[in-house]
């Protein structure tokens, strides 16, 4: 999922995610820097830009934003004064015993992806929580 969202954050160009920018060996005085690895171009620049705009509204739209805190009148996910492009998701969890899906309130897989700053993202964070013990609308 993280790799797929790199295409949205990079104007349609999918990159291999980098978790570490560089590794420094202070004893040897050397630095090894990660190189950008292009995987493909699955979406157009326009589609990526429009998707990011829709993702901004997920956190900023008071009526339809699923990650907008109506009681406080602000986005749930905030990073300084930056607009954050976000998308949340909920999925069913298979029940291995019955071959069907679990049906309890907390028997779900919840996820959120955030890109900051939304116009030209430098960072993407993708978090999943499977079958949370407790739950509220603010994650």
What residue ranges belong to the model's regions?
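Stable alpha-helical elements in mature extracytoplasmic
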Residues: 1, 47-54
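Active-site beta-strand/loop architecture of penicillin-binding DD-peptidases
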Residues: 1-37, 59-139
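Short surface loop/edge beta-strand patches of beta-sandwich-type extracellular domains
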Residues: 37-45
């Amino acid at each position: 999922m993280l790799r797929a969202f790199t295409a949205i954050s990079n104007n349609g160009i999918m990159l291999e995610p980098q978790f570490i920018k560089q590794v420094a060996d202070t004893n040897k005085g050397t630095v090894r820097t990660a190189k950008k690895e292009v995987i493909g171009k699955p979406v157009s620049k326009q589609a990526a830009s429009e998707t990011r705009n829709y993702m901004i509204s997920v956190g900023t739209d008071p009526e339809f934003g699923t990650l907008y805190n109506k009681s406080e009148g602000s986005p749930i996910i905030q990073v300084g004064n930056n607009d954050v492009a976000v998308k949340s998701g909920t999925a069913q969890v298979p029940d291995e015993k019955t071959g069907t899906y679990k049906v309890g309130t907390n028997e779900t897989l919840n996820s959120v992806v955030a890109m900051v700053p939304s116009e030209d993202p430098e960072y993407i964070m993708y978090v999943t929580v499977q079958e949370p013990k407790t739950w509220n609308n603010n994650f």
